[in-house]
């Protein structure tokens, strides 16, 4: 992706180039300092007690599965900071709106993370990612287009796998319902290659390891698709589902699913 972006942008005007914008709200490191630096630079009157809220929210760790009222306590304070920034921007003449908008955008990411601390399910994270994508498209895209890069489980149209019998809305499902035919998702599968995985070992430092897959797992889509003569290819599902391979594609079959920690040979990734 990085190489493609570099090649694509090399002969484009600045307004035609592709830019990176983060959409995830799972990590917010240094957002507090970014906002603090901005407030100090512009000499915006926000008291230190209120600014300390930024530090607390950035440093707050997520206790997955545990009940909390963190968002209910902290969000009103973050809203107060946002209101001061917006009001100061309205009253400022000849100021760089880009700097203000960047600070407010950072604050909104922190607000979404604060929400996620209290509501830490997959559908909550994906809802906030969807809201960020909307904001980016509406405010940053010159032509309404955006290229969204994420795991298959986030960008597919149908929602997450039915874990624990919960009907979970994911990012792709929100995007499909909102943008309808203007949203087109592309999923990736593979059969062989080198996979990275973050290994968690008790009483030891976590480490990143790589593992080699010499052949596809049996009884997977990849086992069949890997037999094609082309190394990389795309299948248009709208066409394929009307062809003679429809029965194969409609059949429930396993597929490798890798999340943030990557591949773990000791765990079933299918």
Question: Which residue ranges define each predicted feature?
Answer:
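Loop/turn elements at helix/coil->beta-strand transitions in domains of secreted/extracellular proteins
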Residues: 13-18, 142-146, 180-183
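Beta-strand elements within well-structured catalytic alpha/beta cores of enzymes
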Residues: 5, 21, 145-151, 185
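Alpha/beta-hydrolase fold catalytic core
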Residues: 95-144, 153
């Amino acid at each position: 992706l990085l190489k493609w972006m570099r090649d694509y942008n090399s002969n484009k005007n600045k307004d035609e180039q592709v830019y990176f914008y983060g959409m995830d709200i799972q990590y917010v490191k240094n957002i507090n300092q970014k906002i603090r630096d901005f407030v100090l630079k512009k000499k915006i009157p926000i008291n230190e007690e209120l600014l300390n809220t930024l530090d607390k929210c950035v440093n707050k760790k997520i206790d997955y599965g545990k009940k909390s009222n963190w968002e209910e306590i902290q969000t009103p304070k973050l809203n107060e900071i946002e209101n001061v920034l917006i009001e100061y921007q309205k009253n400022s003449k000849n100021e760089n709106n880009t700097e203000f908008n960047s600070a407010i955008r950072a604050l909104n990411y922190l607000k979404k993370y604060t929400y996620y601390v209290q509501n830490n399910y997959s559908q909550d994270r994906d809802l906030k990612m969807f809201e960020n994508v909307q904001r980016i498209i509406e405010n940053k895209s010159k032509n309404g287009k955006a290229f969204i890069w994420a795991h298959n489980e986030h960008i597919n149209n149908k929602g997450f796998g039915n874990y624990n019998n919960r009907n979970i809305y994911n990012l792709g499902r929100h995007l499909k319902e909102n943008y309808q035919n203007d949203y087109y998702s592309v999923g990736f599968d593979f059969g062989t290659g080198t996979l990275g995985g973050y290994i968690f070992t008790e009483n030891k430092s976590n480490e990143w390891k790589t593992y080699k897959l010499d052949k596809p797992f049996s009884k997977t889509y990849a086992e069949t698709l890997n037999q094609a003569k082309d190394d990389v290819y795309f299948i248009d599902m709208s066409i394929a589902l009307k062809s003679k391979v429809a029965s194969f594609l409609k059949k429930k079959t396993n597929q490798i699913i890798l999340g943030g920690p990557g591949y773990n040979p000791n765990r079933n990734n299918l």
